[in-house]
């Protein structure tokens, strides 16, 4: 019996190694190019934030005007970093969970290069003043067909791997991956058609753009982050997911509430009143999947606090899940009728967006990257100090942005609503908030310079040649990354 088990384990190791080897180049390409785009996006965010409280900053460069640099900043973060990090996570996770090698690595790699070229072209056009001006869809109209084609070429192979997998259970992570893979083209094509192809009323364009902005996070970035979390939590701890039923409830609650978000941005606009309030209700109800997922993941890792503290992947993932719960709580507080009157035209919305994109998605993506990269490069991370600095500076930076923007935005909104005060008083309040946000972006820049450098060194295969993972504390005899066999993250553990 032991000899049979040993043979099965050997075959399993060979299969995992072959899967990792087949995906090494495309996955590392997406992670490293995404990290470079993230560093650029943070630099642009630093400049955009500085211009809000110091308008004379860099006025000698017309291509760094406030409107241009702000649009380029968010576009680089979403399409340069966010989508590419998601691509790397999706194709690796789906291959591992489907237990199928990738046979189209070259095609995926070429599509990745085309994606980067399209994003670069779009960012340059924005900074030349030739963007569309549509929120989260700032790229010129000719860029979107290229991006949609590249997306199809990159992700179709993951759907094929799932289809041809051996019969068996569908993992919790695969629910979210499949949902995100299918939801993104739906929302992207719908928004592209209504915004760029149909000659509709500008108010329709504004509404569709607001819907796209809300659903891009809830129906793509969030499912990818949760898929990664549901994979890493049982994998690193060596325990199954706490409750299958809670996982199912969290998935379907996100699927039901997520598509309604976004329209809350149109409160007070001349649109049917049920639209913005349906969007606000959706954002309030997002607390339900946040609590369900947070409770499930926390109960999965509870009792393994030492593993969470030592494992880079699990530490980032746990931080991302906690911030997802914070995101849900803030959704409730900021989308009531009295709150929306104060936050509609203030810093608050920006802070809330950064909490979702960086606090939830990016931290979970960092956790996945710290887990995946050693397996596809066959090298361990060089420095635990780099990882620690990346974690603490990231957590401090994103927390500071959210606190400054949300709290400062509410006081800014109160100043706008108080007609007895001069407008200059409100502008002074906004300026004080801007300084805090700018300082926080500086911390994020430091964090991601460490991350980008570390990742580039791993891509060059300059990591440590060791069978022991790089831990955030001194090494101990147990492996905090768990056994390399597939952990059943579909079955329910006893309470």
Feature map (PLM): residue ranges:
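Hydrophobic cores of alpha-helical transmembrane segments in multi-pass integral membrane proteins
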Residues: 27-53, 66-100, 104-129, 142-162, ...
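Short, flexible helix-coil linker/hinge segments at the edges of structured domains or between repeats
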Residues: 195-207
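Short, intrinsically disordered terminal tails adjacent to the first/last structured region
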Residues: 1-12, 474-495
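Long amphipathic alpha-helical scaffold segments
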Residues: 303, 307-310
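Non-cytosolic membrane-interface motifs at loop->transmembrane helix junctions
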Residues: 133-144, 169-173, 204-212, 272-282, ...
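Cytosolic juxtamembrane amphipathic/interface segments immediately preceding
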Residues: 12-27
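Alpha-helical transmembrane bundle and helix-membrane interface signal
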Residues: 164-167, 239
């Amino acid at each position: 019996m032991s000899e049979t088990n040993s043979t099965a384990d050997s075959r399993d190791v060979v299969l995992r190694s072959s899967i990792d080897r087949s995906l090494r180049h495309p996955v590392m390409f997406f992670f490293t190019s995404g990290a470079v785009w993230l560093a650029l996006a943070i630099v642009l965010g630093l400049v955009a934030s500085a211009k809000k409280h110091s308008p004379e900053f860099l006025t000698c460069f017309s291509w760094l005007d406030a409107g241009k640099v702000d649009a380029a900043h968010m576009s680089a973060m979403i399409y340069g970093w966010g989508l590419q990090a998601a691509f790397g996570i999706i194709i690796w996770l789906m291959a591992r969970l489907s237990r199928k090698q990738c046979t189209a690595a070259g095609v995926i790699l070429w599509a990745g290069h085309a994606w980067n070229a399209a994003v670069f072209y779009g960012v340059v056009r924005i900074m030349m003043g030739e963007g569309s001006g549509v929120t989260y869809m700032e790229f010129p109209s000719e860029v979107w067909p290229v991006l949609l084609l590249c997306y199809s070429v990159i992700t179709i192979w993951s759907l094929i791997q799932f289809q041809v997998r051996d019969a068996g259970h569908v993992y919790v992570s695969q629910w979210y991956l499949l949902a995100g893979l299918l939801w993104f083209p739906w929302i992207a094509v719908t928004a592209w058609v209504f915004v760029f192809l149909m000659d509709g009323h500008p108010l329709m364009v504004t509404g569709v753009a607001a819907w796209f902005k809300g659903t891009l996070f809830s129906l793509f970035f969030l499912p990818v982050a949760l898929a990664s979390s549901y994979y890493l939590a049982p994998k690193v701890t060596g325990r199954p997911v706490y409750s299958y039923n809670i996982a199912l409830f969290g998935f379907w609650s996100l699927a039901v509430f997520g598509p309604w978000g976004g329209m809350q941005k149109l409160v007070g606009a001349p649109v049917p009143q049920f639209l913005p309030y349906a969007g606000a209700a959706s954002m309030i109800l997002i607390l339900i999947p946040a609590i369900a997922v947070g409770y499930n993941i926390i109960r999965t890792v509870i009792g393994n606090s030492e593993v969470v503290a030592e494992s880079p992947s699990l530490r980032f993932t746990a931080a991302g899940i906690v911030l997802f719960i914070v995101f849900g709580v803030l959704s409730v507080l900021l989308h009531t009728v009295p709150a929306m009157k104060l936050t509609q035209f203030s810093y608050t919305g920006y802070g809330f967006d950064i909490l979702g994109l960086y606090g939830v998605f990016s931290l979970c993506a960092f956790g996945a990257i710290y887990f995946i990269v050693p397996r596809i490069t066959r090298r361990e991370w060089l420095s635990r100090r780099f990882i620690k600095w990346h974690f603490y500076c990231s957590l401090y930076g994103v927390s500071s942005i959210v606190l400054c923007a949300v709290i400062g935005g509410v006081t800014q909104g109160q100043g706008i609503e108080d007609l007895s005060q001069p407008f200059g008083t409100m502008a002074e309040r906004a300026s004080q908030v801007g300084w805090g946000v700018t300082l926080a972006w500086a911390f994020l820049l430091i964090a991601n310079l460490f991350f980008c450098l570390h990742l580039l060194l791993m891509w060059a295969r300059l990591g440590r040649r060791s069978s022991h993972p790089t831990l955030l504390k001194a090494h101990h005899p147990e492996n905090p990354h768990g056994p390399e066999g597939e952990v059943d993250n579909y079955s329910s553990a006893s309470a």
